[in-house]
Amino acid sequence: MKLCVIAGARSAFLTKSLVKSTRDIRVDHIVLLDNDQQKLKTYGEISRELSRRLDPDLTFEVTSDARAALTGVDYIITTIRAGGDAGRLFDEQTCLAHGVLGQETTGAGGFAMAIRSVPTLVYYCTLAREVANPGHLIFNFTNPSGIITQALRSKGFDNVYG
């Protein structure tokens, strides 16, 4: 089975955990999809090397091509940060300037993050609906995960869990 991590070139720790679990979850192909070319190059190569060392039989790819990454996929994990670190910083500083908590999972900061993230994730979910294997599952870890998961399910993506 094929697994794609959207915004996957940002955490070698996630890659390590996934690669170590591939036999248990019956995954033989992992794709890290990311639109940040620098992170894709740096962390993607670290992740590729981790994969090679931990499970040389695993097919492992890094790419910025969403269509290729999602074609034939069975599982998708989302971990995007729409707006990047600059967006998070802006949200948190704006909230603090107005005397409210600005962290990304609750409150005004989380709501701002959701507003930026939902359209991007709708795009990926729509593309996956077109090119992924029937019955594919999407596991949302994009914060604020509850708000985003509910928004995607409200848009008809009943295969999203988070």
Predicted regions and their residues:
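Rossmann-like dinucleotide-binding core of oxidoreductases
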Residues: 122-129, 134-162
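Residues at the starts of beta-strands that form the adenosine-phosphate
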Residues: 2, 28-29, 59, 137, ...
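Conserved N-terminal Rossmann-fold NAD(P) cofactor-binding segment
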Residues: 37-72, 79, 86-88
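Short helix-capping segments at alpha-helix termini
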Residues: 23-25, 50-57, 131, 156
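Conserved acidic E/D residue at the C-terminus of a beta-strand in Rossmann-like folds
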Residues: 30-37
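Rossmann-fold NAD(P) dinucleotide-binding segment
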Residues: 68-134
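N-terminal Rossmann-like dinucleotide-binding module
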Residues: 1-30
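Gly/Ser/Thr-rich loops at beta-strand to alpha-helix junctions
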Residues: 7-13, 37-39, 140-148
